Amino acid sequence: MYINIFLRSNTFIFLFFLYLLPSCLVSAQSSNKGIIFEGAYTLDLATNLKGGVDQGSAYLGNIDLTFTFDTEKLGFWKNGRFFVYLLNNHGNSLSDLIGDFQIVNNIEANSNSRLYEFWYEHRLKSIKFIIGQHDLNSVFAITEAGRFFINSSFGIQPDISANVLTSIFPLSGLGAIISLKINSNLQLTNAIYDGDPGTEVSNPNSLKWSLNKNDGAFFIHEFSYEIKKDSITHSTYKLGIWNHLQKQIFKGIQKQNSQGIYFIGDKKLTQLEDVDKGVEIFTQVGFSLNQYNPIKSYWGGGFVYHGIFSNRENDAGGIAIAHSRFSDYYQSQFSMDKLQSETAIEISYEFVFSNPLVLKPNVQYIINPGTNTSIPNALMALVRMSYSW
């Protein structure tokens, strides 16, 4: 079954990845000369076992290729670097089988190759600037523990991603970011992004840069506070606010601004000699301040246990829950059954066989997929295989 799905996908992309593999083995040699080449291939084999729109299988693939150029090591100016990120996605849709709103898989996208990021960063003591085509979620609204999981909501939470067009996977846009390190614990980061980077149909390769007043702009501000012990971070708390300026029409009424606020917390519960081992927990909370947005509020949280078994100290396992609550407007317009929420429960375990090779079995149970009572609760399972260098 999976073989047939794979053969219908962009097989040549996978073969091209294999062709590049030998060059990856010598990428570290370039780092001393100011150029770092890194990459990863992620393969998901997934099945919707029960419920949802339909039972069936899906194959999803993701190739990341990144290039970092250090201006000082290359013989130019100090404190600068250029970053280029090439991205390819291939396969088919898992959410089409499930019918969920939050998107169960964080690498799901249309099959295509794109220039995902291209930006310049400059550092001046406690201030850092970034300008260019940039992924908002590489800086803002990040939970380090939540990144362990596969559901999209644990990456970029849906009170942002589902409510506005902005610069996130799989399509980034132009942006400018300034980050100020106030002290060793507190940091303030501000940014402005293109208010409409396009869609996977209108801008499939992320090469169409268009800035005009009709696109509006996306502003985001985030305070980040770290609690450290012996120079090691044990807790991080983030408070963010965003404002999307773009004219939208609802029920014949023109609305321009869309705002939201969020909080994220990461904390290590166990204080072991090896700081990479033990239990860490995370929480995400977000609210939309615009009554016309689809998502009114979001809550997510969970835990990850690193080094559960003494004979597999690099493995990790965890459980997480993502709960999105829909606005009255969305329910009145799009939810015939007036369901108020969708919830995803995820269980994941990661086998680390070597530094670059990881195998991650994953199970998710989706309650009220797409807020539609005609779609039964869904149970899906997948295995993620990833190789990085």
Report the location of each language-model feature.
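Outer membrane beta-barrel transmembrane domains
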Residues: 201-210, 222-224, 240-259, 266, ...
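Outer membrane beta-barrel
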Residues: 56, 60-195, 293-297, 302, ...
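Outer-membrane beta-barrel "beta-signal"
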Residues: 377-389
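Membrane-embedded beta-strand positions of outer-membrane beta-barrel proteins
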Residues: 37-39, 82-86, 129-131, 178, ...
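Transmembrane beta-strand segments of Gram-negative outer membrane beta-barrel proteins
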Residues: 30-49, 82-86, 92, 152, ...
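Short loop/turn motifs that connect adjacent beta-strands in outer-membrane beta-barrel proteins
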Residues: 27-37, 70-82, 126, 185, ...
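Residue-level signature of outer-membrane beta-barrel architecture
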Residues: 30, 43, 69-75, 121-124, ...
